[in-house]
């Protein structure tokens, strides 16, 4: 994301488990797209959780994001459906978004909501009760404990085949200042995670996804919603667990110059909607500014 923000690259491909595309994209004032889980191949991604991990584009604008999404193998034809001309005429008129009440304390978010309303969007405030994803860390720990050795076996050269989390920790300790400046407590948590049968683990993951999807779909039904608008990666965990796609677009800068992103969330497999919403918002705001020291 930093390389894209500084104009060193046209685009980048990030990977997200729960916020790792949305957060850096927001923090660097670029457009980040986390697709419906399973949209793009996960082959080659260093895993945290094969259940949640996904690749996704990080770009300077929505059109570039759509082009890269096509190149990555999006099953929907973003360019044909939302081509250059369509992006220019993208509209938010009549689109019904849920907004989280507490997020309105952020003045940039409050202004973004005004911009959406001026563009014809309908905003419905919802309370801040969000799904309790009990055991989310357990999911990540148990998945990585299994997935990292599989990654080394399938992607690494002969030197590293057979490696696992314990072996990575051992290697890190050889140069702790460079390799582990923040310690290895998360890795240790993975090693300490109790074993769980495949059947029980599958049931556990499916239950978590059901909880997250129930939260979103109940709100959609109750308020006749098209989607949700959030900030940065504030609701990334719930969206990830539900397999919901999300796209963050530059929302402006606070008084210290810190970028923020307006994050659109759509129902499962409704990724195409994100491009239309994001293009419409980008068109009326154009918040991205090239960092001062990187202007040519």
Q: Can you annotate each of these PLM segments?
A:
Residues 9, 72, 76-79, 108, ...:
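Glycine-rich, small-residue loops and helix-cap segments
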Residues 53-58, 101-103, 134-138, 203-205, ...:
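Second-shell loop/turn segments in exported
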Residues 4-6, 70-77, 117-121, 141, ...:
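Sec-exported extracytoplasmic/periplasmic mature domains
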Residues 31-112, 119, 288-295:
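A short helix-breaking turn/cap at a secondary-structure junction
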Residues 1-69, 242-251, 258-263:
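Short glycine/serine-rich loop segments
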Residues 105-127, 149-156, 163-170, 205-222:
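Acyltransferase
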Residues 7-11, 61, 94-95, 118-122, ...:
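Loop/turn elements at helix/coil->beta-strand transitions in domains of secreted/extracellular proteins
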Residues 94, 142-211, 250, 256-262:
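Short helix-loop capping/hinge segments that flank enzyme active sites or metal/cofactor-binding pockets
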């Amino acid at each position: 994301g930093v390389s894209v923000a500084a104009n060193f690259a046209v685009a980048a491909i990030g990977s997200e488990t729960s916020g790792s595309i949305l957060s850096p994209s927001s923090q660097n004032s670029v457009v980040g797209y986390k697709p419906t889980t399973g949209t793009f191949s996960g082959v080659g991604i260093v895993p945290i959780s094969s259940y949640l991990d996904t690749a996704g584009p990080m770009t300077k604008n929505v059109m570039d994001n759509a082009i890269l999404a096509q190149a990555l193998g999006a099953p929907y034809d973003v360019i044909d459906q939302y081509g250059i001309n369509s992006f220019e005429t993208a509209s938010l008129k009549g689109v019904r978004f849920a907004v989280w009440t507490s997020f309105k304390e952020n003045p940039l978010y409050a202004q973004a909501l005004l911009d959406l309303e001026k563009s014809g969007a309908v905003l419905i405030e919802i309370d801040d009760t969000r799904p309790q994803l009990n055991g989310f860390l357990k999911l990540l720990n148990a998945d990585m404990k299994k997935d990292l050795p599989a990654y080394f076996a399938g992607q690494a050269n002969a030197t590293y085949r057979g490696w696992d989390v314990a072996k990575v920790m051992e290697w890190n300790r050889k140069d702790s200042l460079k390799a582990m400046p923040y310690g290895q407590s998360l890795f240790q948590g993975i090693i300490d995670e109790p074993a769980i049968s495949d059947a029980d683990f599958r049931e556990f993951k499916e239950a978590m996804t059901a909880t997250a999807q129930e939260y979103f779909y109940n709100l959609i039904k109750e308020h006749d919603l098209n989607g949700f608008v959030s900030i940065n990666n504030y609701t990334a965990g719930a969206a990830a667990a539900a397999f919901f796609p999300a796209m963050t677009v530059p929302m402006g800068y606070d008084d210290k110059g810190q970028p923020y992103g307006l994050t659109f969330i759509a129902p499962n497999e409704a990724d195409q909607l994100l491009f239309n919403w994001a293009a419409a918002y980008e068109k009326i705001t154009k918040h991205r500014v090239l960092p001062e020291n990187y202007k040519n």
